[in-house]
């Protein structure tokens, strides 16, 4: 029988691998020429040299090293916060799998491979599957941490 920490680590690794693999597979298709155009969403190829909305693009090649330090620092922190990691292994697997996939793009392609362009009614930033998974992972983590944790505390009281 796996200990809780080992089980959480296994869940983290599985989710990390699924998100990372899915994101890289989609990006491979985009890099091989897959395109789509519609009135609402286009699939186009863009190399994002910055982070969200191309922020910090002035850091150029140094950004990928800064991101590696941030990812490693956060992972070390989580390994020290076993309860937090145990309770949110799925969300952290999503965020780390997506984040590492985007950092890999910086090393391999010189920028993050972005491709989803939403333009119905207004122009929105071009993004990718990994960006969505980071948003979903953080969103679920916040919901569970603030809303569901409060319900648990009320039950105990």
Curated annotation (Swiss-Prot):
Membrane topology note: Multi-pass membrane protein
Primary localisation category: membrane
Protein's recorded name: Lipoprotein signal peptidase
Cited function: This protein specifically catalyzes the removal of signal peptides from prolipoproteins.
Family: Belongs to the peptidase A8 family.
E.C. designation(s): 3.4.23.36
Taxonomy, superkingdom: Bacteria
């Amino acid at each position: 029988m796996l200990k809780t920490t080992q089980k959480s680590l296994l869940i983290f690794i599985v989710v990390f691998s699924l998100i990372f693999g899915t994101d890289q597979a989609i990006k491979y298709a985009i890099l091989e020429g897959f395109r789509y155009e519609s009135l609402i969403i286009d699939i186009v190829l863009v190399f994002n040299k910055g982070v969200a909305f191309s922020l910090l693009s002035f850091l150029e090649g140094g950004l990928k090293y800064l991101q590696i330090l941030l990812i490693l620092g956060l992972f070390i922190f989580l390994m020290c916060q076993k309860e937090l990691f145990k309770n949110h292994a799925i969300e952290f697997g999503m965020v780390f799998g997506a984040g590492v996939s985007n950092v890999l793009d910086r090393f391999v392609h010189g920028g993050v491979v972005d491709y989803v362009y939403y333009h119905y009614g207004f122009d929105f930033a071009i993004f990718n599957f990994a960006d969505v998974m980071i948003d979903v992972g953080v969103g679920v983590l916040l919901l569970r941490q603030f809303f569901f944790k409060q319900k648990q505390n009320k039950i105990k009281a």
